[in-house]
Amino acid sequence: MLFHITHTHTPETCPYHDPEKAKATFGKVMSGAEQLGVKLVGAWVDAPAHTVYIVVDTDSVQKIEALLAPAFEIGHAETRPVSDAAAVIQRVTG
């Protein structure tokens, strides 16, 4: 199942100018997906807005919680299940 994650943080907690914080937060998120059984479909950042967008494929919300745990202290995340738009259109239109 696909999930779209939006993580936001403040300028004060931003890891952009702190390489150690970057490794300890999003570095661990990006490198830990496979070990947790989560497929990282893609990740994008809007640095000026302090927002990270991640799409994952997994069968468990608990795996998403474990994946995001390194970034919990610097901000918050919203997780939404999503579907492939082309597949939905095909299903609806036959």
What residue ranges belong to the model's regions?
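Short S/T/G/P-rich N-terminal loop/turn motif that feeds into the first structured element of a domain
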Residues: 1-35, 39-41, 45-50, 62, ...
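Short hydrophobic/aromatic beta-strand micro-patches
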Residues: 8, 55-57
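A short local loop/turn or secondary-structure capping micro-motif enriched for an aromatic residue
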Residues: 13-14, 73-75
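Juxtamembrane helix-loop transition sites at the ends of transmembrane segments
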Residues: 27, 58, 78-81
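Short active-site oxyanion
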Residues: 51-53, 76
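Conserved catalytic core of Hanks-type protein kinase domains
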Residues: 57-58, 70
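Short amphipathic alpha-helices in soluble, non-transmembrane regions
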Residues: 64-72
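Conserved short beta-strand edge segments in small beta-sheet-based binding/regulatory domains
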Residues: 74-86
